[in-house]
């Protein structure tokens, strides 16, 4: 066993002495040592209950003959970090999470590891760690929050963000506003729409590192506890069979994950995160290939923010397995891909059934014949930009309008709430990329402001930053190269005409090549916004959003 390095032989007597100090017995030391990475904390609603999940995981490990050892890692609540300087630290936390798990697993010789995430950056951070470590690993998430009920209809966190704009526009009363605030998030769990956290938890099933049900079983259901026990039991089997992430995270597994992403209409952040996980696994997924997947995989689900349904509705409709089963009918999946069940993806989904055809459409009658995410290219996005096409109003799929340029999210929000943005405009928010932000902040506040004020069907927003999975509208992010790296988004001026054609996968500023070159020659790189601490180091080492915003090779 791998853990023999810390527990076997005369030379390891000091190590055993320390293990005895934990209360471990000789029998427990004979068994596989399984790390349990728990991101429980008391600031994220999606993580407040993870101690219960961890206890269930450890019970499962013990039942199967393993010895669990729990440790913690950090987690940021993107909703609480949103709209202020705290969001600069969210994406960077992904790297810290991956690094911290690597450190713990390597320092203590774990035979296998169970990863317990739930929210936005914690899920990909843990998946990156699994790929990097390549020891038997399984992910069991905390599960989604139930949807709220606001004035008789379902609501969620995106409803609250949009309510801010609606209140400022006089569309709702203060009483209605505060009722939404208090009722939108009724339970623990990851926010209830097909936002980043839930998208990634669902994709974990398609990648093969999560058990069926991982993406959709609600956080407050006893079924989630049973799933955690099963994950604990399964990791011991994976150790015994030496099934590791490198056998699971193949090119085919990532194609399966992106295919599910398109069918679900998932968050644009998945492009960033799946590319980062693939990087750790040594798998190359060019952005152009993601467009190819989108062209052939239909959008089968309209979940919040694109529609009225929530993750609990997807669960009752058959869950991720039912969506995958529907895709398999058209030969859109690699069904022979290995998973942590020890079986193939095809074997996992063979008995799945769709129980609600409005939540999960048939392959013959999709919401859209193409996938929910598109990669755009053009003279302001030579390395690509990302849009959640499934959440864009039909009238905004093609749009041309004058640029309204802002060098920070705060400037843009002030202009939107100040009534300075008109129908037809294209809001450009730059110097918010991985290096420029730094940290590639999510622009949920400005997009929600536009939606709440009724402008989401008339105004587009482009940025080298990111968008929350709760964003809807013509919101085009991850523009690469970013402004801080001399990307052409840096030289756009107020009034320049921006041309967006999502079906054709194009985004351009209507300027001649000569004018662009002239402006670029006069451009000067601004000073970094943060000059000390972790984000200063992050700024130096992070790569382009088009590469997943991973650290450069040989970096930190």
Swiss-Prot record:
Annotated residues that bind Mg(2+) are located at 78, 120-121, 442
Q: What class of enzyme is it?
A: lyase
Supply the InterPro entries for this chain: Dihydro-acid_dehy_C, DihydroxyA_deHydtase, DiOHA_6PGluconate_deHydtase_CS, ILV_EDD_C, ILV_EDD_N, IlvD/EDD_N
Q: Which reaction does it catalyse?
A: (2R)-2,3-dihydroxy-3-methylbutanoate = 3-methyl-2-oxobutanoate + H2O; (2R,3R)-2,3-dihydroxy-3-methylpentanoate = (S)-3-methyl-2-oxopentanoate + H2O
Q: Where is the signal peptide?
A: none
- Return the GO cellular component terms, semicolon-separated: cytosol
Looking at the record's lineage, which domain of life comes first? Bacteria
Q: Which NCBIfam families match?
A: ilvD, PRK00911.1
Q: What is this protein called?
A: Dihydroxy-acid dehydratase
Please tell me the species this chain comes from.
Caldanaerobacter subterraneus subsp. tengcongensis (strain DSM 15242 / JCM 11007 / NBRC 100824 / MB4)
Give me the gene this protein comes from. ilvD
């Amino acid at each position: 066993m791998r853990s023999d390095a810390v527990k076997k032989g005369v030379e390891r007597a000091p190590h055993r002495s320390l293990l005895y100090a934990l209360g471990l017995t000789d029998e427990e030391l004979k068994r596989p040592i399984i790390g349990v990475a728990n991101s429980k904390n008391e600031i994220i609603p999606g993580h407040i209950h993870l101690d219960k999940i961890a206890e269930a995981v450890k019970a499962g490990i013990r039942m199967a003959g393993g010895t669990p050892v729990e440790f913690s890692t950090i987690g940021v609540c993107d909703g609480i970090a949103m709209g202020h300087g705290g969001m600069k630290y969210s994406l960077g936390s992904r790297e810290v999470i991956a690094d911290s798990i690597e450190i713990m697993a390597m320092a203590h010789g774990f035979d296998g590891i169970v990863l317990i995430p739930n929210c936005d950056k914690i899920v990909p951070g843990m998946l990156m760690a699994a790929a990097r470590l390549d020891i038997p690993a399984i992910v069991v998430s905390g599960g989604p929050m139930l949807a709220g009920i606001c004035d008789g209809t379902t609501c969620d966190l995106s409803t609250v963000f949009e309510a801010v704009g609606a209140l400022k526009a006089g569309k709702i009363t203060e009483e209605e506003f505060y009722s939404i605030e208090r009722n939108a998030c009724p339970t623990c769990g990851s926010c209830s729409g097909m936002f980043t956290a839930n998208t990634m938890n669902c994709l974990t099933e398609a990648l093969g590192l999560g058990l069926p049900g991982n993406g959709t079983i609600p956080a407050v259901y006893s079924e989630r506890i049973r799933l955690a026990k099963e994950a604990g039991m399964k990791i011991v089997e994976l150790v015994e069979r030496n099934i590791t992430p490198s056998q699971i995270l193949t090119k085919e597994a990532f194609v399966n994950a992106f295919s599910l992403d398109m069918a679900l209409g998932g968050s644009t952040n998945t492009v960033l995160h799946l590319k980062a996980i693939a990087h750790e696994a040594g798998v190359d997924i060019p952005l152009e290939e993601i467009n190819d997947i989108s062209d052939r995989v239909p959008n089968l689900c309209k979940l919040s923010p694109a529609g009225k349904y929530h993750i609990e509705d997807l669960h009752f409709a058959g869950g991720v397995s039912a969506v995958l089963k529907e895709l398999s009918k058209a030969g859109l999946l690699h069904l022979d891909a290995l998973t942590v069940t020890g079986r193939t993806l095809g074997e996992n989904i063979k008995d799945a059934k769709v129980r609600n055809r409005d939540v999960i459409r048939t392959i013959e009658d999709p919401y859209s014949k193409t996938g929910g995410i598109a990669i755009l290219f053009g003279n302001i996005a030579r390395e690509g930009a990302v849009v959640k096409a499934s959440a864009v109003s039909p009238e905004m799929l093609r749009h041309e309008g004058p640029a309204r340029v802002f060098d920070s999210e705060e400037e843009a929000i002030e202009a939107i709430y100040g009534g300075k943005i008109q129908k037809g405009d294209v809001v450009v928010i730059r110097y918010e990329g991985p290096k420029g932000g730094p940290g590639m902040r999510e622009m949920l506040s400005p997009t929600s402001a536009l939606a709440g004020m009724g402008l989401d069907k008339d105004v587009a927003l482009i940025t080298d930053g990111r968008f929350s999975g709760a964003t809807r509208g013509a919101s085009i992010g991850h523009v690469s190269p970013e402004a801080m790296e001399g990307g052409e988004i840096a030289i756009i001026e107020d009034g320049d005409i921006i041309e967006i054609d999502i079906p054709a996968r194009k985004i351009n500023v209507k300027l001649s090549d000569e004018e662009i070159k002239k402006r670029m020659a006069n451009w000067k790189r601004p000073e970094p916004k943060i000059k000390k601490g972790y984000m200063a180091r992050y700024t130096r080492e992070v790569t382009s959003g088009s590469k997943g915003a991973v650290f450069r090779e040989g970096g930190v």
